[in-house]
Amino acid sequence: MKKFYSVILWGICIAAAVGLLLLLGSLMSSTSVKAEKPVIYLYPEQEQEVSVRLDYDGDLTCTYPEYKDGWTVTAKPDGRLTDRTGTEYNYLYWEGTSDWEYDFSEGFCVAGEDSAQFLEEALAKLGLTRREANEFIVYWLPRLEANAYNLISFQTEAYTEHAGLVIEPKPDTVIRVFMAYQPTDSRQEIPEQELDAPARTGFTVVEWGGCEADPG
């Protein structure tokens, strides 16, 4: 009988250990946040070769054109890019996963149904052209409108410190717009974020992207 109870106890211990490992695995995987569709536009003053390298504190999951050790393209003032095979692109695209935290100390609480108007106004303040803003909105609008409300914060150092851009030749103006959002069922109070952008002068680089952040 003693041996029987020992076997049962041993089985319980194994089951508990397995359950704990599964729980820990679930918690660890839930902290991974995906940076979705950051795209990079290059606008030199004259046609020239440009190299772009990512210094990303995470794992790249998709790039187009293929990233390899970086991108090297011929960029034109209107933003058209051509690689060494002659293939033309509108922008450089990448996605990645990371486990760093985003800053929601300031931002906006926006009703899902008001997302389009909010983005049009916010992206203009952040320096995107109408074409760039349109591409941002058509990608993110369906996700934002699906929620009752969204806490939205445009990331600054919390993003750029973990996702650096190394560009040669060095651009005169860099505009990086990265939107982190958290769905919520009700309106939340949050200090309003001030939005601005540098003037576009000389060789200008623009990047936009976003993610649904873990509410933590």
Please state what every model-predicted region is:
Residues 23-216:
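Protease-labile, long low-complexity intrinsically disordered regions enriched in Pro/Ser/Thr
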